[in-house]
Amino acid sequence: MEKQDITFNKNEDTMKLLISKMERKLAEIKLGGGKKSIEKHHAKGKLTARERIELLLDKDSPRQEIGAFVADGMYEEYGGCPSGGVVIKIGYVTGKQCIVVANDATVKAGAWFPIAAKKNLRAQEIAMENRLPIIYLVDSAGVFLPMQDEIFPDKE
């Protein structure tokens, strides 16, 4: 076996491990506030943000989540904020491509952390740049009060 083949195989193995780690992290992030929070949500007859988006988007149409890893490792002193507490997907509704933004009420009752405002602004930028309609599915407690002084309606 040549040195190039050994290097390739080593790089391939490393990449597979990284992809596996990323997929595990994404599965954890998609639980939002966690399994117990999802169960409480369902017990109230409510759907999660991702469930609501999936029901809205055209069945079997392409879709892409934006910013799933946003806020990873942030706000740990408050229990974390998976995906910034907001789920954003680009997909199709009745054949028209659009952006859907949904507060994740399993994360601190959908309250806005500073990063949620930035993520929402980014969704609006993408919508404007690509001339896409934007749909909001709001289920939010409002601003996360311990950090309310850090949330502004602009980019900075």
PLM segments and residue spans:
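Terminal-region recognition feature
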Residues: M1-E156
